[in-house]
Amino acid sequence: ESVKLKESGKVKEVVAISIGEDKAQESIRKALAVGADKGIHVKIDSYVEPLGIAKILKKIVEKEKPDMVFLGKQAIDDDCNQTGQMLAALLNWPQATFTSKVNLKDKSIEIIREIDEGLETVEVNLPAVVTCDLRLNEPRFASLPNIMKAKKKPLEQIDASELGIDTKPRIEQIKVEEPPKRKAGIKVANVEELVQKLKN
């Protein structure tokens, strides 16, 4: 979405950030290949909770001074849906969550978000934190020439320990387990048989 805004002339620069092990650079290179201008990799080898991620991002935001920060609404590993909200609180910025459509204005951003009752339109002043829903856009595929160009774009690496942030976990994970296996279903020949089985 940031790249689309840049292509429309409303945004000057797109910076892609990833926090994690060395393999996190792959995500940044993909972002550079589809149009981001530069990347920042904050290297940390241990698991970081959403609050720790938000603290790291706050440091980067204070250095880069963007007008907007786009994040996914939740991570695929822990599904927490907390980082964007925590970042907005730490920065004391307005936030727009679960965004499925964006309209950037002069000093504000209007977003559409999906809620239980339908679609809600919200406008927040800039600078702002925006968390994005999957419906916001279709992922782009990078062409081979753009993949090659991405290798020449700047990718800064920062060690998380240099930021002076406490990223120690506040939550103790006791265990993770798969859900119990379901019993096999019963096939029925027709609706009448199904009704009988449901009655009994």
Predicted regions and their residues:
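N-terminal glycine-rich FAD/FM-binding segment characteristic of electron-transfer flavoproteins
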Residues: 1-200
